[in-house]
Structure formats: structure tokens, C-alpha cells
Amino acid sequence: MSVLSALTVCSVSAQSEKFNYDTVIATWQPRQLSIASIDEAEKILTSSRYLQAKGDERERIVRFTNIMRQKFDSLNAGQKERLVVLEARLLQGIHKFEQAKQHLNQIARFRSPAAQLLLADINVQQGNAKKAKENCEKLVGQTSFLIAFTCMVNADFSQNKDVKFLKKLSAFETYTSTVRPAERQWFYEVLADMSLQLGNAEAALEHLSQTEFEKLPISAMLVWADAHFALNNYKAVSSGFSNSVPDILTADDGLLLKWAIAERAQGIVRSEVQTQLAKNMEIRVWREDSSHAAQVATYFLEIEPNYPLALKFAEINWQYAQSLDDKNLLERARQANEVSTNA
């Protein structure tokens, strides 16, 4: 899950069609307004993590960063660093983790809390908990204590699912009353994720309820869905998303995937959601999309069984992301493919 927003205001049944690299997953009405500042660009990128995202945020920010690059020498030191971090966040968003880290080397001598948080997040996704914790430790004295401590405990837990880390983090709940809403929301999201992974879905839902549902980032909504799945409450997921998602055409694929899983568990085999998801997956398969490889693998494991394809994308995902979740996905795909091959 991304932590950076805590400091700044992841066989097809659809009808086949020809694709090229201009084929889009989502569509939107063109926007005429350009981004005016780095501050605005940061806010827009953060907004892309929420239900109200229009789907064009990334494209708009890429245009903005390209323009700013032409003016790079005229920017002051602070502006240069913020631009580099913004560009690195774009790279992280498409799982180009090594490129993102190399990009951040441009500001190695002066790294803001935002840069350290981004590096910590990338290292967690790559399965390097030790390095992630080192990044988190550099936040001490540079940002709120709650953010620094949550970052460190989250790094530890990413490679060692021990209840002691949950207890350690829970002890600092008292500090949530003095931090900004975004920091508070992230703290509870981390607590929820830990609780769920330790088998306490009820506690996970309780932590997530500290934030109004529609104001949760999509990453937290995915945890919310998994918590309900653990309780066999699939109707809550399909109903919750049906009441909250403004447009499935621009909805996040991860969210659509959870929604489709909930529908299938209720015996719903055809729906607008599943049709849209199938179209999105077909395009991602054609592109061999590495940034959504985990979602593609899960789709072909749980929605439209195609185990060789699931394994292919689990292996693609593993080339970039090596958290415990990614390892488990790869093992699931290997086992499913082996069973189907030997059947």
C-alpha cells in the first residue's frame, strides 16, 4: 500500500478485438485545464488513489512533468526535488521500481520525508524490509512521530507477520488525535491490514471504520473487501461497491476484481462489472502489462481459470514485486498450473 499520500495533500470472456498501444483501459472526457504547479500535480496524483478519480490523472501529470523538465535548470532546489519525487512516484505506479530508485539518486544528498517514504514503500514492495526500515528511520525528526513509527513497524511486519508488531503499533493509537487526517487514515489502514493478515477480520473492519468509507483510498477498500471475504460476507462487498463506485468504466482494476470475486461467490456469473473487467484484462494480457500483473494473475486464478496464463503473469509480477503476498501469489499459480497439467 502506498504511504506517500500521508505526507502529500496496486481465458478472457470478452469479445476479441484488435489492440494497439493507444488502446485505453478507461475513457474520459478531455480536460482543457493544464496543471499550474507542482503542488497541484501532487494533489492530483494523490486524488488518483480514490474512488472519485477520473482516470486521466496520470496522463495529465506526465504532460506536466515533461513541461517542467524543460524548465528544470530554472527551478530552485526545493522545486527540483519535488519534481524528481513526483516523477519517481509515476515510475513506482507502473512498477518500475528500480528506475524510480535510480531517479531518486538525483537528490541523494538532500531527501525530503516524501522521498524517504517513497523509497520505503518501494523497498517493501520489492521485499527488502531491512532497507525499507532504514528509510523509515530517516523520517524521525523530519515528520510526525506517528508516520515515522508506523513506517518502521510496517516495514518489519512486511517480512515477519508477528502479532508483536500489531501490538506495538496499536499502543500508539493515542497519538492519532494530534495528526492530520491523512496520517490518521494511513495509521488505521496499516493496523487493519496487519489485523487481517493475522486472522482478525473483525478488527480490520473496525480499524477501517475510523474513516468514512467513501473517503478511504482504494488500497484501504481492498483490505475492507478482503476482510469481508474472510467473513464470507460477499454481499457486503458487492453492495458497498455498487453504492459507492461512481463509474465502472474508470474504476480501479483491483476494485473491479474484488467486486467480481464477490459476485461469483454469490452465483452471479454475468454482470456489467465482470464484462468491464474482462475487457480490461484482455487488454492487459495483450500488452503483457507488468504494472497490473498481480491482478491479471489473480483474475485467471479466481474469475476465468486459465492457469498457464495465471502463472505467466505471476512470474512477470515476481520480476518486479517480491513481497510475501507476491510470493504467495506465485506459489498459488504454480500449484494450480501443476494440478491442471497433471489432471
Predicted regions, residues:
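Residue-level recognition of tetratricopeptide repeat
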Residues: R49, R89, D121, N154, ...
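Structural motif corresponding to the intra-repeat A-B loop/turn of tetratricopeptide repeats
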Residues: K54-G55, I94, Q126, Q159-N160, ...
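Solenoid-like repeat scaffolds
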Residues: Q29-A36, R69-A77, L104-R111, C136-F145, ...
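Canonical tetratricopeptide repeat
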Residues: L86, L118, C151-M152, V190, ...
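Primarily a tetratricopeptide repeat
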Residues: R63, Q102, E134, K167, ...
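TPR-repeat structural position
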Residues: E57-R58, F97, A129, D162-F165, ...
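N-terminal leader/linker segments that initiate helical-solenoid repeat arrays
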Residues: C10-L83, H95, Q102, E338-V339
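Start-of-helix register in tetratricopeptide repeats
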Residues: E42, R82, A114, I147-F149, ...
